């Protein structure tokens, strides 16, 4: 199945021996659209595949389970798919990446799935978002360089597109008014002076 995008197309065609896949989902707009695309692929081409949602709930972002669940229920409503049991675990903010890696490793050891997907996107260019490059704490610290979508046992279908490309996927797939509103697209931490996780961001 081909998902076209002006920044980078994504084609998914999993081998027939892959029948269980993991999906890292936070409740944000990026992982939500990957969730929808995978569900659409499963429903239309590979009904033998089970998608297993995985959420690491950071201690400074306690809303992640709530919004991840909202996304899953909406995608089930839109596609008719039934997800596998939602796997989630509390993780420490200061060890967020390491704790998530350990969590995923434990799920692989249980042979719950053969590979997993994540909704990591590309960073905008410095010309498009100079403010992100002037704040030392603003840019993500994980590797978001332009790279192959396939890497080892995980897949990053959005790694070569930025937030505008994500919005384009929502528009092309016709879910901007149905799926996007149930996502949590802005960052908030429980230590923030204004901790309002119910106010949505604009695209």
Task: Name each model-derived stretch.
Residues 1-203:
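Nucleotide-activated chemistry modules centered on ATP-dependent adenylation/adenylyltransferase
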């Amino acid at each position: 199945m081909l998902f076209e995008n002006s920044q980078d197309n994504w084609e998914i065609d999993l081998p027939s021996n892959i029948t269980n896949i993991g999906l890292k989902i936070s409740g944000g707009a990026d992982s939500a659209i990957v969730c929808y695309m995978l569900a659409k692929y499963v429903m239309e081409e590979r009904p033998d595949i089970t998608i297993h949602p995985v959420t690491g709930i950071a201690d400074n972002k306690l809303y992640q389970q709530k919004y991840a669940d909202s996304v899953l229920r909406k995608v089930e409503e839109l596609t008719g798919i039934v997800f596998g049991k939602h796997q989630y675990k509390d993780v420490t903010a200061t060890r967020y990446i390491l704790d998530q890696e350990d969590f995923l490793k434990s799920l692989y050891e249980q042979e719950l799935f053969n590979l997993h997907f994540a909704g990591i996107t590309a960073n905008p260019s410095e010309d498009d978002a100079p403010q992100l490059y002037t704040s030392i704490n603003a840019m993500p610290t994980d590797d978001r360089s332009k790279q192959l979508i396939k890497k080892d046992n995980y897949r990053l279908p959005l790694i070569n597109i930025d937030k505008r490309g994500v919005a384009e996927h929502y528009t092309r797939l016709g879910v901007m008014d149905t799926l996007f509103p149930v996502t949590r697209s802005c960052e908030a931490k429980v230590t923030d002076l204004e901790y309002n996780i119910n106010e949505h961001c604009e695209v």
